[in-house]
């Protein structure tokens, strides 16, 4: 499955300062579905280069990270249980900024 992953609000610094990633992900289990929980695990293993604790806490994103799936807040679509489809665009934006 192909996805576009975008990181903003400083999260791109955890991915070698690359904001947009076009990725291909093979299904992690024998089913035909991939969930946000599966994707987050893949991102932690394959994209996050440093300080993964700044992006994730346990199995989910840290508080203060806005997640959009095809421009829709993931809280409206089931969060970790959100089912992803080929060519989806997932955006991660940190809403926490120093000052």
Swiss-Prot record:
Q: How is it modified after translation?
A: C-terminal thiocarboxylation occurs in 2 steps, it is first acyl-adenylated (-COAMP) via the hesA/moeB/thiF part of the MOCS3 homolog, then thiocarboxylated (-COSH) via the rhodanese domain of the MOCS3 homolog.
Q: Does the keyword tRNA processing apply?
A: yes
Keywords, A to Z, come to: Cytoplasm, Isopeptide bond, tRNA processing, Ubl conjugation pathway
Task: Provide GO CC annotations from the record.
Answer: cytosol
- Keyword hit for tRNA processing: yes
Give the subcellular location: Cytoplasm
Q: Where do we see the Glycyl lysine isopeptide (Gly-Lys) (interchain with K-? in acceptor proteins) cross-link in this protein?
A: 99
One BP term from GO: tRNA wobble uridine modification
Per the record, the similarity remark reads: Belongs to the URM1 family.
The record describes the protein's role as: Acts as a sulfur carrier required for 2-thiolation of mcm(5)S(2)U at tRNA wobble positions of cytosolic tRNA(Lys), tRNA(Glu) and tRNA(Gln). Serves as sulfur donor in tRNA 2-thiolation reaction by being thiocarboxylated (-COSH) at its C-terminus by MOCS3. The sulfur is then transferred to tRNA to form 2-thiolation of mcm(5)S(2)U. Also acts as a ubiquitin-like protein (UBL) that is covalently conjugated via an isopeptide bond to lysine residues of target proteins.
Q: Which PANTHER family match?
A: RURM1 PROTEIN (PTHR14986)
Q: What is the protein named?
A: Ubiquitin-related modifier 1 homolog 2
- Organism source for this protein? Arabidopsis thaliana (Mouse-ear cress)
* Name of the gene: URM1-2
